[in-house]
């Protein structure tokens, strides 16, 4: 689950935590499921239970956004691929906020492993091609790169969504504070006017 390190961003983090808990209680209930938390908020939510998991040897995943680089994302992606190839896990999904615009984010549950091949609709004629290097070598090289890019994209999407959610939340907070200030100023002026009127009546 990918969250942020900081709050003040509306329901950004709670939406991810709620989605993860929903999957643990639903689709993944009865399985030995582990949650790798990327971001401090997810780590705080799951470290107290038996689902939170910190991979060894790749650094603390919850600190990813302190230094978000492709290399750090690649380390985590490689760890997930190694665990899958070793048969230690059967399925990996990435849960993150997809950036739509500054005011809107969608919670995504994106399959990571195993890779599900897509089949194109309709018949398409393809000629015979000679691949150099071989098809196998190309696939073995491209798939890990593609998965690393997929994870990095999810992290970047989440990072952009965090800033958008925080900007929107702070804008609403500013508007609410302005409304409150206006209402309090009006109440103060009314009370002050009433006090002055009472003083004038007492003098008369």
Residue ranges and their predicted role:
Residues 1-204:
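C-terminal beta-strand-loop-alpha-helix "lid" module of Rossmann-like NAD(P)-dependent dehydrogenases
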């Amino acid at each position: 689950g990918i969250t942020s390190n900081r709050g003040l961003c509306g329901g950004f983090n709670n939406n991810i935590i709620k989605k993860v808990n929903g999957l643990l209680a639903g689709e993944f209930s009865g399985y030995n499921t582990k949650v790798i938390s990327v971001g401090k908020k997810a780590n705080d939510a799951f470290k107290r239970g038996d689902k939170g998991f910190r991979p060894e040897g790749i650094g603390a995943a919850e600190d990813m956004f302190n230094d978000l680089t492709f290399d750090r994302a690649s380390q985590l992606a490689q760890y997930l691929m190694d665990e899958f190839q070793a048969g230690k896990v059967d399925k990996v999904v990435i849960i993150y906020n997809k950036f739509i615009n500054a005011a809107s984010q969608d919670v995504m549950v994106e399959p990571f492993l195993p890779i599900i091949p897509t089949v194109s609709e309709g018949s398409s004629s393809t000629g015979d091609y000679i691949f150099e290097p071989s098809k196998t070598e190309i696939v073995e090289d491209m798939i890990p790169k593609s998965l690393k890019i997929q994870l990095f994209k999810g992290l970047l999407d989440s990072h952009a969504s965090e800033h958008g959610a925080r900007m929107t939340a702070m804008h609403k907070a500013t508007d609410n504070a302005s409304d409150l200030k206006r209402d309090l100023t009006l109440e103060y002026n009314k009370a002050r006017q009433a006090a002055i009127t009472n003083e004038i009546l007492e003098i008369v």
